Amino acid sequence: RFQIASLVVYYSFLQRKERIFLFLVGRLADIGKSAIFACMKLEISDWNMIPYAGAWSRQTEWFDALVRAKQAGEDYVNHIVLCEHPHVYTLGRSGKERNMLLGEEQLRRIGATLYHIDRGGDITYHGPGQLVCYPILNLEDFSLGLKEYVHLLEEAVIRVCASFGIVAGRLEKATGVWLEGDTPRARKICAIGVRSSHFVTMHGLALNVNTDLRYFSYINPCGFIDKGVTSLQKELGHEVPMEEVKERLCKELVNLLS
């Protein structure tokens, strides 16, 4: 048990087919002269390498279940999912087809697929060596609005980058995490795109760890034609242990949600 200001975080490790962390987060909220102790569950699951369609279907099930339980006043669990995907491109609701630079036959040749999905944002790439994180959260549990939530995701990644000695930050009017964002050398290391309904979220962030960046050359990443992409591996000059990045990201997300 760890005491963090007015927050108590209980941590336990469960060994299953998937690696799962279970956090019970207790928050003290002052109402008048009384204090109410609210307890909520936050489960962190590692799906490892999983095809995009399967992950999308599964997180949609969890998202729908959380929305239903919230509306019915029933118990529910907040989730943070970690995974990697085989080569895939996803186009968000506001995305433009012209930002996909390959046709169907060319996509098959490079072993990739394209999905039109229900998150915000334009087109992005997911593939081996990229850490994808899908938080499925009731934002009201954490006193967050949608803009604050996106800012929190960015902040978690900025802190992870800093832990590796990389200075990262934000770029005005461009969601995600960037290096040298206000210079001609601006390059994106993490894309963010979310969906929210009834203050429940799905989709999330994609952090380039040991990603094959050549796959970004087949798109205009997030709709940009004048900015680059990078990875932890490219910036550091060596491969980065994925498990280490997962642990650091989980730590930062839990600390910020707390």
Feature map (PLM): residue ranges:
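Short hydrophobic targeting helices and cationic amphipathic motifs
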Residues: 3, 7, 14, 22-24
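N-terminal lobe of the biotin/lipoate ligase/transferase fold
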Residues: 39-186, 239-240
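Short conserved catalytic/interaction loops centered on acidic-Pro-aromatic/His motifs
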Residues: 166-171, 202-203, 215-219
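C-terminal accessory segment of soluble enzyme catalytic cores
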Residues: 178, 195, 213-258
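Histidine/acidic-rich helix-loop-helix segments that form or flank divalent-metal centers
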Residues: 189-192
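Conserved phosphate/anionic-ligand binding catalytic regions in large, soluble enzymes, centered on
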Residues: 200-208
